[in-house]
Amino acid sequence: MYAAVEHGPVLCSDSNILCLSWKGRVPKSEKEKPVCRRRYYEEGWLATGNGRGVVGVTFTSSHCRRDRSTPQRINFNLRGHNSEVVLVRWNEPYQKLATCDADGGIFVWIQYEGRWSVELVNDRGAQVSDFTWSHDGTQALISYRDGFVLVGSVSGQRHWSSEINLESQITCGIWTPDDQQVLFGTADGQVIVMDCHGRMLAHVLLHESDGILSMSWNYPIFLVEDSSESDTDSDDYSPPQDGPAAYPIPVQNTKPLLTVSFTSGDISLMNNYDDLSPTVIRSGLKEVVAQWCTQGDLLAVAGMEQQAQLSELPNGPLLKSAMVKFYNVRGEHIFTLDTLVQRPIISICWGHRDSRLLMASGPALYVVRVEHRVSSLQLLCQQAIASTLREDKDVNKLTLPPRLCSYLSTAFIPTIKPPIPDPNNMRDFVSYPSAGNERLHCTMKRTEDDPEVGGPCYTLYLEYLGGLVPILKGRRISKLRPEFVIMDPRTDSKSDEIYGNSLISTVIDSCNCSDSSDIELSDDWAAKKSPKISRSSKSPKLPRISIEARKSPKLPRAAQEISRSPRLPMRKPSMGSPSLTRREFPFEDITQHNYLAQVTSNIWGTKFKIVGLAAFLPTNLGAVIYKTSLLHLQPRQMTIYLPEVRKISMDYINLPVFNPNVFSEDEDDLPVTGASGVPENNPPCTVNIPIAPIHSSAQALSPTQSIGLVQSLLANQNVQLDVLTNQTTAVGSAEHAGDAATQYPVSSRYSNPGQVIFGGVEMGRIIQNPPQLPLPPPPPPPPQAPMQLSAVDHGDRDHEHLQKSAKALRPVPQLAAEGDAVVFSAPQEVQVAKMNPPPPYPGTIPAAPTTAAPPPPLPPPQPPVDVCLKKGDFSLYPTAAHYQPPLGYERITTFDSSGNVEEVCRPRTRMLCSQNTYTLPGPGSSATLRLTATEKKVPQPCTSATLNRLTVPRYSIPTGDPPPYPEIASQLAQGRSAAQRLDNSLIHATLRRNNREVALKMAQLADSSRAPLQPLAKPKGGAAGAVAQLPARPPPALYTCSQCSGAGPSSQSGAALAHAISTSPLASQSSYNLLSPPDTSRDRTDYVNSAFTEDEALSQHCQLEKPLRHPPLPEAAVTMKRPPPYQWDPMLGEDVWVPQERTAQPTVPNPLKLSPLMLGQGQHLDVARVPFVPPKSPSSPTATFPTGYGMGMPYPGSYNNPSLPGVQAPCSPKDALSQAQFAQQESAVVLQPAYPPSLSYCTLPPTYPGSSTCSSVQLPPIALHPWNSYSTCPPMQNTQGTLPPKPHLVVEKPLVSPPPAELQSHMGTEVMVETADNFQEVLSLTESPVPQRTEKFGKKNRKRLDSRAEEGSVQAITEGKVKKDARTLSDFNSLISSPRLGREKKKVKSQKDQLKSKKLNKTNEFQDSSESEPELFISGDELMNQSQGSKKGWKSKRSLRTASELEEFKCRKASEKEDGRLGSQGFVYVMANKQPLWNEATQVYQLDFGGRVTQESAKNFQIELEGRQVMQFGRIDGNAYILDFQYPFSAVQAFAVALANVTQRLK
C-alpha cells in the first residue's frame, strides 16, 4: 500500500479540532440509487467539532476533477453548543448528525432544504463519554462517564437506560455488528457487555494496568444497501491510475475483529470480547487513535512516537512528529506514514471509501491519500514530483506529455477545498467576486473601541471547518459620520503564511483565547500595519475623499497644488469638523495602511459610497442609499448600486484600471469630489486612484495641472509620456513619414471640460499638424477640446515604444479628447474614427464632450500619413497612435458638470477622437497599441498591450460567434498597428484566404461603392457582403475599429473600419472591424491579420469571423496590397473586436457617438475603401468605405445624409433596428456623409467586454444600456472633404452623436453603438472612460444626449429589430453587460418612459449633483437609469437577458472563467433589499434567514437580484453578525455594505 499527505496549503480552523466524522453523499432520489455507489463515495461531508463549540460540516470530494460542480454551499458552521464539541457522529442511513459537547449537551441535527436545524436536544448535565449509532442507524447508544447508559431511537424515543455502578469511568460504548449487544470499556481496563434490552451479560477484565481508550470492529459502520459492487459501472468512472481514487474490493471476513486500544499504546485484535488469545499490536506510539477502514482490511493507528526519556518531551525540538501506522487484520505492520505534524493527532477518520484518511491535530486538518494496493511506479513518481513542485502551477513548466501533466496535476486537487483558493493571494480573493454561484458565508465581529485606532474595528471572517478565517478588517475613521476604511489583507507578509505550518501554533494558541484576542489575531493578520502601527493617523483622521468646494467649478488651490495625487483625499473643512492638514496624514501613512476601500457617507447616514483606494480596484465600488418611511413605521429601504468588479491580469499590466468615479462625499451634504488635487498626505484616500476626467464646461485643469496630474497618474502606471513633462507635447505627428514628431504647445487651459488631460497637449493643437477634422463638437462641449497625447513624441515609432506604454503610440492617438476630432497630429488620417472606439474599457477615457474646435477638415494631405506609416516604422498609425497602448493606463482627473471629480484610467494609447467620439480606442487597444509600432514586436501584442490583453479579455463566445473581440489580437490590432504586424503574418495567412474572398466581394462592393455596400450589407454571407453582414450579424461587425479613423492617408482605406463584420457570412460572428488604417505599409494589413492571428486561438473561434471582419479591410490600396481582405488595421480591428452587436439594441446610438471615427476627409474615403476596397480597387476606397460604412451604418436610413443611403441599404439587415433607432436619435445628424466611414470605424464600444481596450475586466460586465446613455460625443466627422462631415449634424445634438456611433455600429454595430454608449456609462462605473465621455459632453449635454439618444435610438433600436439583433448580438452584449439590454427593453416602452427613468436615475443617483451622471456609481445616467429607472434596473437587464440574453450571460460567465477573470468591468447592478413580512402574531417584521440569524434587529436585511438572494446580513450576537453573499458582490463590497449598515441609525 501507499499513503501520502495531500499537497497544498494546510487546512485549519480557528480552534482545536476535537473530533471528526465523515459520511458519503446520499442519492437524491430513487432514480439515482441504481448507479454505482462509488459515485456517492467520491463526494461527501466531513463533520468536525472544535473547541469553540461550533460544529463544521464541510464538503469533500475525491474524484480529483476540477470540472465537477460543487454544492453552492460547501461549508456549514452549526452553532448552538455552549462548550467545546467533543463528539460528532454521522447517521448515514438517516442523514442525521449527532454532536455532543463537554457539558453533556447532545444535539441531533438534520438538514432540510439546504439548512441545518436541531431536531433533538438532550442535556443530562453529565459528560458524555461516547455516542454510537447502531449499524442500521435506527438506535443510538449514549454512555456517560458517571456510568449512566441509554439506548434510544433515531427519532428521540428512549428504549432503555441503566446505571452501571463502577469505581471507574466508562470511556467508550459500541454496538456489536449484529446490533444485538452493546459493549462498554472502562478506564480500568474492563469490558461490560449488555444486550440490546439493557440486561447485563458479562463483565470482563482485559488489562489490569491500562485503561481502555476506545473499541471498534473491523466492520462497516453502517450497513447501507449497496446497489452495485462494480467500480466501473458509473458513467464517470475514472481508471485506477488515479491512484488513491481506486477502491479496493471489500474484504470478506469470516468473523469481525474487536479492536481495543489501551492507554499504553498497545492494541488488541480479538475475535470477541472473551477472546483469550488476542493478537496484540505494539504500536510504540502514545496518545493512540485507531480506526478500521470501511472495508475492514486496514487499521490506521495514529499517535506520537514515544520518547526514550520523558524529560526531553518538554523541549520542542526533541519532540518527534506524529506518525500513522497501518496494520492488516493479522496485526502485521504494513506501512508507516511520517508526518511533519508536531502536535498529537486528536482524531482520525476514513472517508471516500477508504481512499482518504482525515486527521485532526490541533486546529489543523490533514488529508492523507491512501492506495491500498501495491503502489504503481506512476503513483510514486507522481508523489515524488508533486512534493518537489509544491504548487500546481509549476506542473506546466515540466516537459511532460499532456496526459502525464494531467495525472500529475491531480495530486494538487484538494479533497477539501481551501477557504481561500490561493492563500498567498488574499487580495484577489477579497477584491473580486467569486465565480459561478459560489456563495461565501461569513461572520462579522466587532471589537471594542480602541482609542488608538479612533473607532471600533470590525473583522470579516470566512466560515470554514467550524472556525473563522479572517479575510478583511475595517475600522471606523470618523466619530461624526459612519465612515470606514477597509484594510488590505496583504499589508503583512505573514498573512501569506496564515495557512502555513509556521503559523499553526500561533493560530491554535489564540484559538482558545477570548473572542477579543481572536479578533486581535485576525487584525494582525488582516492588517498588520493597521491602526495601531500607524498611530499617526488617528481616528477621524482619515479624511474623506472629497474636494473642498465640490460645487465650485474650480479645483481648490490645494488640490491644484497637489494635482499629482488626484486621489488623495482632502478633508473638507465643514460641518464644524476641523480640517486636517497634510501633515496629519503623511503620504507614507497611506501606503503604510494599504487600504483597500473607504466607506463614506453623508452626515445623515442615509447615503454611502464605497470608494476603492487600492490601485487594483476601481475607484467606484458601489453606493448604498437608505430610504425611510414617515415616522419610521415601515422597514427601511435600501438601494445598492454595485459595479461589477473584474480582475485585470497582472501579466499584462500591473497598473490598476479604474472606473471613472467621483470620489466625493455624499451628494447631499458635502458634495466633495476627490479632486485631482487631494493632499498626498491624506490617508487611505488612495494615492494612485485615477480620477476619471470629469469635464464640465465650468471647470478645466490648466495644462500644467493636467500634465502634472497625468504624470502622476502615469507614473503610477509606469507610463512615461514625453509630453507629460512638457507643456507642449511632442506629438509624433503621424506625419507622412510618421517619423516626425510634432510638438504642440499645450493650451494654457483646455477649453473644454471634455478635454482629456493627457500630456497636457491640447487635442486641437495636436490636430494642427494633420488637417484638423472639423468635428462638430457636441453642443455641450466647447468647440475645441484639446486632446492631449499622453505620449509626446512617437519617435519611438517602434513597437517597442508602443510596448513601452510609456509613450502613447502616437501623441495624438493618446489624445483622448472627449469629442475632439481625432486629431492625430501627425497622421493625417483621422484617428477620430479610431478614437471613436468606444471607451468601454476602463482605461479609456472618452474626451470630454468638448469637441476640439472642429479643426479644419482634414484635407487630403492626410495621404502623407501613409508615408508616415512606414511599414516597419509605422510605429503608430494614426491608428496605432490612436491606440498608444504601450503606455499602459492613463489616469485622468476631471470634473463633471456637477463639480464631482472623476478619475479615469484609460489605456495609455489614446486616439484623438472627435469630440463626439470617445478616444477610447479599442478597449485594449490603447495600451496595447504600443506593440503596434513594430512588427518585430510580434510577441509584444500581449505584452505591450498590457491593457490590450486585458481589454480583449476573451469571452467565451459561442463557437458560431466570432470572438467578441479577438481578444488580444483585436485589441492589439487596434492598439498596436505594429503589433498587428506581428501577428499579421498569421492573421494574414488566416485572413488572407478569407480576405481574398472578402476582398473580391469587397472590391465588388467597393466598386459598387455604396450600392454594392447596400447589397453587401444585405448579404450576410459574402465577404464583400461583410458590410451587409454586419447588419445581418452586426454584433461582431459592431466591433468598430476605433483605429479605423487613424488610418494614414495612404491607409485612408486603412481607416476602413471595415468592421470585419461586414465581411463574410459570419458577419454576425465577425464583429471585428478591421479598421486598421491601411498604413502606408502593407504590413498594416498584415498587422490586421496578425492581430487576428494573435487572436488565432480565438481565430479558430473567429476564423470565420476574421475573414468577415477583415474582408474589406484591405485598407485602401495599401491594405489591399495585403490581399487578405481583412486589411483592417489589427489595431483597429482589435478595438472593433468589441462587438456592438451584443449591445446592439440600445447600444447602437451610443456607438454612433463613438462612431465619430474621424478620418481626414480623404481618409474618410480611404476608410470607406478600407476593408471593403478589394485590393484591386483601392481607389474605390471611398466608395468602398461608404459601402463598408454603409454596411457599417445601419442607420444610414435614419441618417439624413443621403450619401448614407447606400450604407443604409447595406444596413437593411439591421436596418430596421438601426435605422429606426438612428432616426429617433436624429440619425441624420449622426449620419454624415463622412460618417459612414466613421461608422465603419464603429467605435466598437467596449461594450464587448473582451474587446474593451481598457481590458479592465470591468468592461464585460458593463451593462449595454450604459453605452446608450452615454451617447458619446456626436461623432466627430473628419469633416474630410470627401464626406461633408455634416459636422453640423453631429453638432446638432449630442444625441446625434450617439447615432453616429450607431452608424458605426450600423453594421450590426448599431447594437454595438448602443452598447458602446451603455458601455461607456458602465465604464464610468467600471473605471471606463464612460464618465469621460459623459463628462465630455458636459453632464447636461450628455444628459440630453443620453435621454434623447436613449429614447430615440435605444427605443428605436429596441423597438426595431434591434432587440432581436441585439439578442443576436446578445452573446457580445451579454458579455458587455446585460444592463444595457435591460435598458433597451425598458426603452422599448417609450421615450417618455426612458426620460422618466433617466430623471429617476438622476434623482436617485447617489451623487449630489442631480445633473451630473450618477455619481460614478453607475457610471452614467444610463446605468442609473437602467438600474434606477425602475429601481429594478436589474429587472430590465433581466428581461433583456431572457432567452438569448440569458445565453449570452452564461457565455460571458464562461468566458470570464476562461479568461481567468480577465475582462472588462461589468455594468452596475442596482439592487434593493427584500421587504420583510409582517407577523401579526408577534407584531414584528420578519425575514427568513435560513436559520443563520438568531436575533431580531432592524439592521437585518436581505438583498435580491433578479429574484434571487445575493446577500443577507443579520445579528447573531451582541457584537457578531452573519454576512452571506455571492456574485456580483466581492468580499470588499459586501463588507463595505455591511459596515454601512451596522452603524445605520435609521430604524
Swiss-Prot record:
Residues 364-414 form the SOCS box domain. Transmembrane segments: none annotated. GO terms for cellular component: cytoplasm. It comes from the Eukaryota. Residues 533-546 have a biased composition (Low complexity). The keyword Phosphoprotein applies. It is found in: Cytoplasm. Keywords: Cytoplasm, Methylation, Phosphoprotein, Repeat, Ubl conjugation pathway, WD repeat. PROSITE patterns: SOCS, WD_REPEATS_2, WD_REPEATS_REGION. The modification Asymmetric dimethylarginine is found at R949, R954. Pathway: Protein modification; protein ubiquitination. Pfam families: Beta-prop_WDR35_TULP_N, SOCS_box, Tub. Its main location: cytoplasm. Residues 530-580, 1374-1414 are annotated as: Disordered. Residues 1436-1547 are annotated as: TUB. WD repeats lie at residues 80-119, 123-162, 165-204. InterPro entries: Beta-prop_WDR35_TULP_N, SOCS_box, Tubby-like_C, Tubby_C, Tumour_necrosis_fac-like_dom, WD40/YVTN_repeat-like_dom_sf, WD40_repeat_dom_sf, WD40_rpt. One of its GO terms (biological process) is protein ubiquitination. The modification Phosphoserine is found at S577, S1347, S1378. May be a substrate-recognition component of a SCF-like ECS (Elongin-Cullin-SOCS-box protein) E3 ubiquitin ligase complex which mediates the ubiquitination and subsequent proteasomal degradation of target proteins. Belongs to the TUB family. The SOCS box domain mediates the interaction with the Elongin BC complex, an adapter module in different E3 ubiquitin ligase complexes. This is Tubby-related protein 4. It comes from Mus musculus (Mouse).
